[in-house]
From Swiss-Prot:
Name listed for the protein in its UniProt record: Lectin alpha chain
Source organism per UniProt: Macropsychanthus bicolor
PROSITE patterns hit by this protein: LECTIN_LEGUME_ALPHA, LECTIN_LEGUME_BETA
Function: D-mannose/D-glucose-binding lectin. Induces histamine release in mast cells from hamster and rat. Induces lymphocyte proliferation and IFNG production.
UniProt-annotated location(s): Vacuole, Aleurone grain; Vacuole
Length: 237
């Protein structure tokens, strides 16, 4: 099975797998059952921004979700990622819909990782920015239903030709290059990720959510990981 660390924007509460009974953001360490959650005042039809950061000195993974003109939601969890993730990983975005549906549109995505070692050469860093997405992206690995559209957006889950969200869809997008996320000699390993998103839904209960995730480089969509499992996990354990 894949080794996954994720920040979830969970639009549909699945209380049977430990979700709080409201939309929330959460931090997932190797399981869909979040280690830490915070209530998320999701606003359909508005562009939101997510900022995620990790610092190996503080050993804290944190995420902030905000919409222009309204208060932000923050969640954090103390974890030593050296003990969880392999040394090399890929970073990605995932989303699902189920019986209920929503658009899971990504408008922009950036990521920076840094490995500070005691040596003079501090070359172990990776940075990418997508302010828009090309139609045939060479620098993204698209999995499942994920596509890029003519407006320069990344649609993680299926939409109709008129832009309406489709149910029972799962899609992921990974940056093509593996990331050296930690090494034994590193003094500090840190990363920052930011993405902007737009969720629209005709349903009273949009579903299911979007994640930013980090996984082993050969990660793929697990069988049966749709809906509440957000395209990341094969089961709810």
């Amino acid at each position: 099975a894949d080794t996954i660390v994720a920040v979830e924007l969970d639009s549909y509460p699945n209380t049977d797998i430990g979700d709080p009974n409201y939309p929330h953001i959460g931090i997932d360490i190797k399981s869909i059952r979040s280690k830490s959650t915070a209530r998320w005042n999701m606003q359909t039809g508005k562009v939101g921004t997510v900022h995620i950061s990790y610092n190996s000195v503080a050993k804290r993974l944190s995420a902030v979700v905000s919409y222009t003109g309204s208060s932000s939601t923050t969640v954090s969890y103390d974890v030593d990622l050296n003990n969880v993730l392999p040394e090399w990983v890929r970073v990605g975005l995932s989303a699902t819909t189920g019986l209920y549906k929503e658009t899971n549109t990504i408008l922009s995505w950036s990521f920076t990782s840094k490995l500070k070692t005691n040596s003079i050469a501090d070359a172990n860093s990776l940075h990418f920015t997508f302010n828009q997405f090309s139609q045939n992206p060479k620098d993204l690995i698209l999995q499942g239903d994920a596509t890029t559209d003519s407006d320069g957006n990344l649609e993680l889950t299926k939409v109709s030709s008129s832009g309406d969200p489709q149910g029972n869809s799962v899609g992921r997008a990974l940056f093509y290059a593996p990331v050296h996320i930690w090494e034994k000699s590193a003094v500090v390993a840190s990363f920052d990720a930011t993405f902007t998103f737009l969720i629209k839904s005709p349903d009273r209960d949009p579903a299911d959510g979007i994640t930013f995730f980090i996984a082993n480089p050969d990660t793929s969509i697990p069988s049966g990981s749709g809906g509440r499992l957000l395209g990341l996990f094969p089961d709810a354990n």
